């Protein structure tokens, strides 16, 4: 396989991952983006639900209590985390949500179709792709009442460095991981990854030409730092 073919495959993989996860973000006064994270919508034969981190929910609740006009969106669709909460776990740092029909129609992404849930845990010889929407890739037009907010997915392909029954760790060394695609301006070493929390981690299954959702980012700090992918429940 030549370099061009490999890059095209990576670009297609990145686009697929981007279609399966969305930024969850909230603003105040229709002017300021206050904070946000990443959410994956999962579709099983029994239910449709969204997953992000418990700490993302807690930050939203804190800001909602402090600012009466906080308005939340999942992608481009309206979303109220508090009203749609199914359950949460501080231990696993995960929260699950109902996704209203209006949000599903308008959030601009697809749900991940899970044939079985939960999946088999990640192992050290697995090849995985994971990503999310860091604040450093967020763009808001200048001036009051900006009409749009755009944000870019940051994603990586690599193997885990450590696995346990409860969590998986990755070391995001820019010299060792593969960016999807090989972007012209990758994040610099030390760049904040805040906003990637809740992003999905997929196992690559080339023999079946598919990816399998196997976890969620629970702690994203900086490039060249460790973070963990939580066990799905």
Describe each PLM feature range.
Residues 39, 132-134, 151-166, 170, ...:
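Glycine-centered structural positions embedded in regular secondary structure
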Residues 184-217:
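Catalytic nucleophile loop of clan PA
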Residues 64-70, 106-114, 192-193:
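Extended Gly/Ser/Thr-rich low-complexity repeat segments
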Residues 5-87, 95-102, 156, 160, ...:
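Catalytic histidine site
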Residues 47-52, 56-60, 88-124, 136-142:
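Conserved active-site neighborhood of the chymotrypsin/trypsin-like protease fold
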Residues 114-162:
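Short glycine/Trp-rich loop-beta-loop segment that forms part of the substrate-binding cleft
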Residues 207-233:
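Long hydrophobic alpha-helical segments typical of transmembrane helices together
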Residues 166-189:
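A conserved mid-domain beta-alpha-beta active-site/ligand-binding segment of alpha/beta enzyme cores
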């Amino acid at each position: 396989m030549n370099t061009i073919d490999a890059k095209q495959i990576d670009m297609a993989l990145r686009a697929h991952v981007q279609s399966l996860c969305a930024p969850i973000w909230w603003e105040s006064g229709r002017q300021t983006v206050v904070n946000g994270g990443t959410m994956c919508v999962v579709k099983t034969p029994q239910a449709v639900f969204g997953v992000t981190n418990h700490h993302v929910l807690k930050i939203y609740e804190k800001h909602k209590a402090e600012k009466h006009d906080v308005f939340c969106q999942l992608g481009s669709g309206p979303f109220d985390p508090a009203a749609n909460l199914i359950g949460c776990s501080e231990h696993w740092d995960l929260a699950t949500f109902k996704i209203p029909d209006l949000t599903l129609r308008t959030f601009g992404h697809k749900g991940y179709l899970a044939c079985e849930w939960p999946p088999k845990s990640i192992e050290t010889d697995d090849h995985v792709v994971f990503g999310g929407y860091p604040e450093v890739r967020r763009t808001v037009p200048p001036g009051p009442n900006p009409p749009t907010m755009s944000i870019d997915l940051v994603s990586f392909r690599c193997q885990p460095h450590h696995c346990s029954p409860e969590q998986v760790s990755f070391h995001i060394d820019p010299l060792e991981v593969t960016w999807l695609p090989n972007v012209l301006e990758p994040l610099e070493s030390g760049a904040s990854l805040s906003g990637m929390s809740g992003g999905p981690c997929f196992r690559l299954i080339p023999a079946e030409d598919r990816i399998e959702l196997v976890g969620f980012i629970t702690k994203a700090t900086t490039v060249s730092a460790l973070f963990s992918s939580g066990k799905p429940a």
